[in-house]
């Protein structure tokens, strides 16, 4: 169950055939000649040295007993080894597998088995994570074996402290080979774009804009929202006006924003939404955030990512990005791919209007999208993974209305008047993410939120660091076998970010699977905080104290006290945030946390925007204040999120936090969150699906059909 054996971490070269060789164990370990064939630990082709990796850093031996990167609640190193002839039965615990190691002095130390799982695409191979005994010093080679159902494996060599020395191989021991497993290290940088690439993209965009007669602002970002190139063409508008539908002057409708902020939001959105398995544009984003899905079709529920535009905000404390505005649904942002690899995004702003496409049927081709498409010649997304090859609920997503982008002669970059390039002089920025393995699943963490920590509440009413690790591990293991909704090729597993917070919204741990879309990093925390906040005993009081008592009163009118008596998931909370209640049903009143449909717009959706509006405006208008909280409400520093993918967590009947999931289909997010929450779920009697509002049962969770691969 290791995701690094899949997707973009290929070229992982796994053996294609294994030669099962007869071997014998020493008599001192018991006669196993009458046993059925036991597990076989896999070694190199030329020796009995194990195929083994540090499960966090992916480094090869020699290993230290104390981990170079601390994992969980203890400093011990975890290593991965691999076996054949080992498959746990359904519902069989990993305790069925044991392991030990013998050093040169014949000291035999038990090794804790922490994970046993099938290697994806190699059902005959099993990965095993072992925690080294901290008593192991610089002992050199030890002989490691495992036991399962009375059967004892061969012993393989593992170097501790240094390689060499140790006991001689067991009598009759031979290599149990396969072709070398080579785990490719993750890209050390946030992009593979060079300064020349950025110059080419800007020159192609500026040339297209010149040929169309529309000067624009051009922004190039890497995958993690670092701005690599900024070029405001002479004569391009300096500002844009936020305008969609609804009442002018309400929410952000009518607000003036800087053109470079709008362009950056577009580039960031395209970069954050795109991976090796899907390429989404800002047109895609605008399609999935409106009051109906598809937009304009009555009596359809809201978009699956309704509310995502208010994430990755410049005022937040999680994913602090240069865009400030959050995510964009305004056409003109496209992902950049280099040699088929996701590398960043381009954003074009120049029409003076920051909006969303309210009519996806008119096949409009705004010049901003034309220019972005022209700029990407040579940097296009692979056709197979574009949004228009991905269906959600049977609905094909849009990508770009530009079929044949303009291709005028390119003006040399050096001849572009006023060009301003901010490509970092030291080269591409380092990634904020570090490789890590949690629950046997390969992914990435930020050192800001790793190692995982315990909750901040008094002892006994909080999550321990070990429990946080268990929750995230269970979620990651479920994600690794969950059929993805938005990835190509079909049959890929979901790739998500998992976040756990305590009851006060303090982040206890965040884990991102390899190639999970980066927008989910901020959103997962938002979802977790939202579930913890609205399930708390003080939610109503804190909202009222912050000046949002009108929403509390509307909830009370619907029988919702916001006093901790109901365990709210984000699916339930989002249901209450829709401009129609029930969701999508025309001619009904708005949910208690939404604005009325007569005033509603994607830039004025109710409580979600209102609690962040003051601080958001302060970072998008001069002097662009450097805030690190979006609200005045404790526990909601990066705002709230209102589409599914979170579960509140309880321990001994007490709210101790929440888990948030983001990165794939919302039903998949719910399923993965439920797996993480297993053992910490709310009592059935207080779940949101036991509550009726206006005669309508609130939802709790919704799982996809046949979810597992």
Predicted regions: what they are:
Residues 1-9:
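N-terminal secretory signal peptides that target proteins for export/translocation
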């Amino acid at each position: 169950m290791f995701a690094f054996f899949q997707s973009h971490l290929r070229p992982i070269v796994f053996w294609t055939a294994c030669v099962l060789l007869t071997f014998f164990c020493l008599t001192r370990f018991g006669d196993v000649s009458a046993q059925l064939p036991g597990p076989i630990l896999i070694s190199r082709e030329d020796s009995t040295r194990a195929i083994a990796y540090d499960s966090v850093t992916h480094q090869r031996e020699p290993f230290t007993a104390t981990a170079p990167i601390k994992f969980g609640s203890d400093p011990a190193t975890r290593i991965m080894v691999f076996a054949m002839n080992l498959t746990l039965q359904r519902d069989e615990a990993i305790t069925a597998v044991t392991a030990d190691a013998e050093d040169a002095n014949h000291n035999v130390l038990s090794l804790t088995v922490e994970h046993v799982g099938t290697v994806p695409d190699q059902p005959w191979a099993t990965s095993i994570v072992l925690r080294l005994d901290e008593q192991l010093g610089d002992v050199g080679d030890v002989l490691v074996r495992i036991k399962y159902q009375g059967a004892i494996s061969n012993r393989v060599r593992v170097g501790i402290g240094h390689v060499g020395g140790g006991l001689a191989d067991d009598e009759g021991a031979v290599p149990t080979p396969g072709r070398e497993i080579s785990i490719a290290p993750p890209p050390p940088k946030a992009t593979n774009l060079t300064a020349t690439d950025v110059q080419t993209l800007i020159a192609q965009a500026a040339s297209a804009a010149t040929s169309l007669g529309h000067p624009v602002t051009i922004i190039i970002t890497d995958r993690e929202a670092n701005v690599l190139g900024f070029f405001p063409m002479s004569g391009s508008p300096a500002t844009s006006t936020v305008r969609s539908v609804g009442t002018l002057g309400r929410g952000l409708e009518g607000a003036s924003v800087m053109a470079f902020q709008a362009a950056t939001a577009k580039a960031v959105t395209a970069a954050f939404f795109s991976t090796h398995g899907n390429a989404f544009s800002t047109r895609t984003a605008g399609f999935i955030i409106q009051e109906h899905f598809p937009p304009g079709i009555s009596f359809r529920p809201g978009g699956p990512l309704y509310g995502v535009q208010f994430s990755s905000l410049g005022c937040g404390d999680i994913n602090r990005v240069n865009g400030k505005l959050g995510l964009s649904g305004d056409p003109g942002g496209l992902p950049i791919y280099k040699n088929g690899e996701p590398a960043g995004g381009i954003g074009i702003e120049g029409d003076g209007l920051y909006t969303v496409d309210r009519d996806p049927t008119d096949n409009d081709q705004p010049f901003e999208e034309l220019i972005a498409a022209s700029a990407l010649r040579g940097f296009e997304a692979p056709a197979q993974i574009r949004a228009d090859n991905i269906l959600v609920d049977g609905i094909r997503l849009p990508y770009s209305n530009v079929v044949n982008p303009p291709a005028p002669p390119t003006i040399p970059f050096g001849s572009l008047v006023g060009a301003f390039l901010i490509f970092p002089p030291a080269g591409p920025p380092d990634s904020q993410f570090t490789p890590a393995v949690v629950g046997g699943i390969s992914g990435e963490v930020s050192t800001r939120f790793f190692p995982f920590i315990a909750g901040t509440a008094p002892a006994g009413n909080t999550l321990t660091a070990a429990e946080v690790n268990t929750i995230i591990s269970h979620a990651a293991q479920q994600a690794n076998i969950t059929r993805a909704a938005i990835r190509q090729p079909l049959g890929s597993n979901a790739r998500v970010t998992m976040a756990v917070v305590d009851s006060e919204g303090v982040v206890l741990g965040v884990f991102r699977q390899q190639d999970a879309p980066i927008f989910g990093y901020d959103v997962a925390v938002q979802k977790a905080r939202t579930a913890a906040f609205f399930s708390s005993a003080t939610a109503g009081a804190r909202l009222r104290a912050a000046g949002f008592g009108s929403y509390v009163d509307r909830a009370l009118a619907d029988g919702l006290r916001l006093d901790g008596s109901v365990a709210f998931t984000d699916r339930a909370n989002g249901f209450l945030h829709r401009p129609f209640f029930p969701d999508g049903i025309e001619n009904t009143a708005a949910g208690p946390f939404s604005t009325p449909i007569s005033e509603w717009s994607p830039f004025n959706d109710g409580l979600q925007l209102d609690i962040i509006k003051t601080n958001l405006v302060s970072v998008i208008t001069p002097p662009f204040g450097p805030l690190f909280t979006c609200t005045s409400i404790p526990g909601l520093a990066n705002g709230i999120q209102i589409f599914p993918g979170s579960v509140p967590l309880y321990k001994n009947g007490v709210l101790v936090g929440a888990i948030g999931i983001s990165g794939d289909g919302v039903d998949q997010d719910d399923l993965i969150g439920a797996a993480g929450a297993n053992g910490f779920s709310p009592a059935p009697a207080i779940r949101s699906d036991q509550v009726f509002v206006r005669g309508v049962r609130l939802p709790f969770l919704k799982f996809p059909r046949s979810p597992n691969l």
